[in-house]
Amino acid sequence: SLENEGYDGEVHYYDFEGAPMALSVFPGSLIVPWPYGGFGIEVMDANGGWVATATDLLRFVTALDSGKLIKADTLTTMVSHPMAPLWQGSSYYYGMGWLVRPNGNSANWWHTGSLPGTYSIVVRTFNGFAWAALFNTRPEDVDAFSKELDNALWDAYNGVTSWPTNDLFK
């Protein structure tokens, strides 16, 4: 989480304008920007810590979906509805690592992530399309930003009338 410990080529992370500074969780520093010492990503459990491009995330989703990374039964378990009473009465639910919205016999599934200085979303639609967006900042009103971004990405997807047939990873 310290600025001088990033990977080669890793972006700089920015907090929102006017964001308060943080008391560093690392020895030797006192007051720091939140993205660089306000929390210790190194000691977090299952949240955060990935350094990836949007293409990397899409390759990951494609590999999940293809059966090359995990078995189809494992993916089915990951996106299955949790046991009652969790998420009862909701149009979507949290499976194992994915938010899931059923759509007929399939589902849209997605994951968002956000810490000071970062925001990400990756979506896989019920019919196999996927997209990802990564930001090296997190707005002050992250919930409003998340909704606006999600709506804009769905609008873009729904506006496409002809999709390429070639492998976009090549």
PLM regions and their residue ranges:
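Short, gly/Ser/Thr-rich active-site loops of penicillin-recognizing serine hydrolases
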Residues: 140-170
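Short conserved micro-motifs at the rims of enzyme active sites and ligand-binding pockets
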Residues: 110, 121, 134-135, 143-146
